[in-house]
């Protein structure tokens, strides 16, 4: 998708830079970061991240800086208006989701409720 179109999910520069670095380490330019939601965690739903070289029918791909973020349609409905970012701090480094649809989140930020 083009940067000129309003996207339902933001893929930040920091996240795209980290994905680009990790893909270079794997030496597989076809890899994309997939964000998904599953049941579980202390708040009912949890975020997951994996690298995937497949884009399934119905998936949304957001391109930034030559790398892609892929989201399946079921997960996307819970992520609309949110962002995928990458942070480094005292707690370590990780991809994080900021989700305005979450009614509550757990302390670690990896699970949420709607």
UniProtKB/Swiss-Prot annotation:
Recorded hits in SUPFAM superfamilies, A to Z, give: HesB-like domain
Entry keyword annotation includes Magnesium: no
Cofactor(s) recorded in Swiss-Prot or TrEMBL: iron-sulfur cluster
* Any one cellular-component term (Gene Ontology): cytosol
Alphabetized, the UniProt keywords read: Iron, Iron-sulfur, Metal-binding
Q: How is the cofactor bound?
A: Binds 1 iron-sulfur cluster per subunit. A study found 40-50% as [2Fe-2S] clusters, 15-25% as [4Fe-4S] clusters and the rest as paramagnetic iron.
One Pfam family this sequence matches: Fe-S_biosyn
Phenotype of null mutants: Reduced amounts of quinones.
Source organism, top-level taxon: Bacteria
GO-annotated biological processes: aerobic respiration; anaerobic respiration; iron-sulfur cluster assembly; protein maturation
PROSITE patterns named in the record: HESB
Enumerate the GO terms in the molecular function aspect.
2 iron, 2 sulfur cluster binding; 4 iron, 4 sulfur cluster binding; iron ion binding
The consequence of residue 106 to S is: Does not complement knockout
Residues binding iron-sulfur cluster, per UniProt: 42, 106, 108
Per the record, the similarity remark reads: Belongs to the HesB/IscA family.
What subunit structure does UniProt give? Homodimer.
Q: What is this protein's function per UniProt?
A: Probably involved in the insertion of Fe-S clusters into apoproteins in vivo including IspG and/or IspH. Essential for growth under aerobic conditions and for anaerobic respiration but not for fermentation. In vitro it binds Fe-S clusters and transfers them to apo-IspG, which is involved in quinone biosynthesis among many other cell components. Experiments indicate that it is probably also involved in the insertion of other Fe-S clusters than IspG/IspH.
Q: What is this protein called?
A: Iron-sulfur cluster insertion protein ErpA
**Which species is listed as the source?**
Escherichia coli (strain K12)
Which gene does this sequence derive from?
erpA
